[in-house]
Amino acid sequence: MELWRQCTHWLIQCRVLPPSHRVTWDGAQVCELAQALRDGVLLCQLLNNLLPHAINLREVNLRPQMSQFLCLKNIRTFLSTCCEKFGLKRSELFEAFDLFDVQDFGKVIYTLSALSWTPIAQNRGIMPFPTEEESVGDEDIYSGLSDQIDDTVEEDEDLYDCVENEEAEGDEIYEDLMRSEPVSMPPKMTEYDKRCCCLREIQQTEEKYTDTLGSIQQHFLKPLQRFLKPQDIEIIFINIEDLLRVHTHFLKEMKEALGTPGAANLYQVFIKYKERFLVYGRYCSQVESASKHLDRVAAAREDVQMKLEECSQRANNGRFTLRDLLMVPMQRVLKYHLLLQELVKHTQEAMEKENLRLALDAMRDLAQCVNEVKRDNETLRQITNFQLSIENLDQSLAHYGRPKIDGELKITSVERRSKMDRYAFLLDKALLICKRRGDSYDLKDFVNLHSFQVRDDSSGDRDNKKWSHMFLLIEDQGAQGYELFFKTRELKKKWMEQFEMAISNIYPENATANGHDFQMFSFEETTSCKACQMLLRGTFYQGYRCHRCRASAHKECLGRVPPCGRHGQDFPGTMKKDKLHRRAQDKKRNELGLPKMEVFQEYYGLPPPPGAIGPFLRLNPGDIVELTKAEAEQNWWEGRNTSTNEIGWFPCNRVKPYVHGPPQDLSVHLWYAGPMERAGAESILANRSDGTFLVRQRVKDAAEFAISIKYNVEVKHIKIMTAEGLYRITEKKAFRGLTELVEFYQQNSLKDCFKSLDTTLQFPFKEPEKRTISRPAVGSTKYFGTAKARYDFCARDRSELSLKEGDIIKILNKKGQQGWWRGEIYGRVGWFPANYVEEDYSEYC
């Protein structure tokens, strides 16, 4: 058996790889094992499986999303622990880039083999590899792995189901505290009986939880005040006394509501206390630091350690330490929506059920808010790691939003035209361009994205050579610009998507709707959205605030916020007049039949137009420009780029007279179907793979064309508009020929034109159907029912899934991130907040 397959078998025995992972399938390749390991997460989990607590998983980024910085940090944590706790020699270890870039995967296998032979690993009763009888020689298969990895699209999220859930330990403590004596149940329970059980559980667990808070105050906080400084007490106990006060009143009102017939007013108590429970925001954001501080204080002072043991003995006979109990409030606040969900399920009366749903929504919203505080704490740790690794950085990265992506690229700038090797960190509001020096980074340029925009350049994609895939980052005024080059087309696509997402976070759709001026904002206090009344989530840049009236909103709610109270009343009318004026100008230009020029040399604003004659006009080779002002003796002309509809000034030496060429022979293309009706296209594409397309001549009008494409199991039709000798499917971009249009959308997603159509033109219909090796039944993509979106949700980066109210989502995973589920819709896969959907239990499979 090949050595890498022996390694795979060993990793399965160590409970790191699931037995059904695709690396075990017939026809599996070694690159699939490399891809599974290269972010370092499973390697760190491996060490913990062999030696419990060998690595503190809080120091490992469990969702690195292939961030090179975070993956390398995880890998180096694994390597250092192999030395320190497993006794491996330095000579037995691979280098971090041997795995991440798969420069020497044979050395990675060698290290794992050495690890399997250590006494610690063998004590687990797992057979090491290779055994003496088995052959080792499979070095040849490791060559070229780096190129194969470059073509790998996404990591396998199901892998992380094998990683320890850091919440599990706290959950066990909570369940232990809340456990009650079993009550005898009737042999056959009615829905009424089940509802009574739910109500009893809500009351009993609230009583026990309030007692636990009282015990923390009485048996730990007060006795320790004589041993610790006031600042230590505040750091360790945070606002636990505020929690106790709130829950004492909450329990009193809950009991009163439960004492009324049918507990009809219980829902009002939960809705009323949603706002008071916002004190959990502070507690949950600081509890991890509190636990670490407690550990440091106890380790430094033996008298404190002894006092803590004494307090624990008095509080609960030593069953739970203070560190254990500090995790309970976070667990409790995340349980209310689960308790109410069960109560709703067993409530029959329609009005009661509807009222309880309001309470359930309130507690789901609260739970999501708490989960986002935890997620943002992880994000801030990630930002801190970036900050500490970048030299010459004199400002806080947290002011520039959440990290989007990081990695190696090549770059040219206006000042320096030769390609430079660089490492870049992209955040919501900034791009950091650095030079890597070992494990640290030297900041070379800090780009504030507020004044930049992204423009694709697909010229390098045709060659498909390494480092030829490029797009441009251009300053609005044209004084500065960068060309960013990427190793593969897929990497370029990922980076471009994240740039577009970052810029859409800075300038979101509907930012100026209803007279507002919404900007990304970090709210110090927990705040509700003006439109939907739900909480803004997290600890920083939770949403948007209007610069004028201070209204707060989610990104997805900006268009629904009531009109701005601080803005002039003529705003809507002014907008309407401007739009009508632009339409009149467009009509006038068409009537005049202005001369057209063809661009043969690009222009991105350098040199800028002289003086203040007007904005520059971006030009790409092949664009058609309609002249609006042009004199032969002048060097600068004004025109409209018909590809983008932008108007501006450009040097006249970048264009030549446009000559309309002879009609193209389309029959040579595998995608051209000739004259065809919609029904004919649907018949051809019905049994083809998603992404298969054809271009047809419309039967009713031979001068017009349409694209038909199979997407999300349906056939969609897109009209191609023809005017002025140009072809377009949207007003944003025009092409000189049908071939150029098709080639562009073979490389660029149609979602820029149609939001629900996130696909490229992938497979011409005349190409033979390429069937990939089918997965075994055990490995087939399974989903755990469906859910219906109750609200809009706007993704903040490419790992998230945007939703529209009413969307039906296939649920793929509920385990990854607390409060977030992974799902699929319209062929797109990503994470979305669980409280934004209503699950359809009838479709569970």
From Swiss-Prot:
Widely expressed in hematopoietic cells but not in other cell types. PROSITE patterns: CH, DH_1, DH_2, PH_DOMAIN, SH2, SH3, ZF_DAG_PE_1, ZF_DAG_PE_2. Residues 194-373 form the DH domain. Residues 402-504 form the PH domain. The modification Phosphotyrosine is found at Y826, Y844. A zinc finger (Phorbol-ester/DAG-type) spans 515-564. Residues 1-119 form the Calponin-homology (CH) domain. Residues 592-660, 782-842 form the SH3 domain. Residues 671-765 form the SH2 domain. One of its GO terms (molecular function) is phosphotyrosine residue binding. GO terms for biological process: cell migration; cellular response to xenobiotic stimulus; Fc-epsilon receptor signaling pathway; Fc-gamma receptor signaling pathway involved in phagocytosis; G protein-coupled receptor signaling pathway; immune response-regulating cell surface receptor signaling pathway; integrin-mediated signaling pathway; natural killer cell activation. Keywords: Guanine-nucleotide releasing factor, Metal-binding, Phosphoprotein, Proto-oncogene, Repeat, SH2 domain, SH3 domain, Zinc, Zinc-finger. Phosphorylated on tyrosine residues by HCK in response to IFNG and bacterial lipopolysaccharide (LPS). Phosphorylated by FYN. GO terms for cellular component: cell-cell junction; cytoplasm; cytosol; plasma membrane. 'Vav' stands for the sixth letter of the Hebrew alphabet. The DH domain is involved in interaction with CCPG1. PANTHER family: PROTEIN VAV, PROTO-ONCOGENE VAV. Couples tyrosine kinase signals with the activation of the Rho/Rac GTPases, thus leading to cell differentiation and/or proliferation. Interacts with SHB. Interacts with SH2B2, GRB2, GRB3, DOCK2, SLA, TEC and ZNF655/VIK. Interacts with SIAH2; without leading to its degradation. Associates with BLNK, PLCG1, GRB2 and NCK1 in a B-cell antigen receptor-dependent fashion. Interacts with CBLB; which inhibits tyrosine phosphorylation and down-regulates activity. May interact with CCPG1. Interacts with CLNK. Interacts with THEMIS2. Interacts with NEK3 and this interaction is prolactin-dependent. Interacts with ITK. Interacts with PTK2B/PYK2. Interacts with HCK. Interacts with PTK2B/PYK2. Interacts (via SH2 domain) with SYK. This is Proto-oncogene vav. It comes from Homo sapiens (Human).
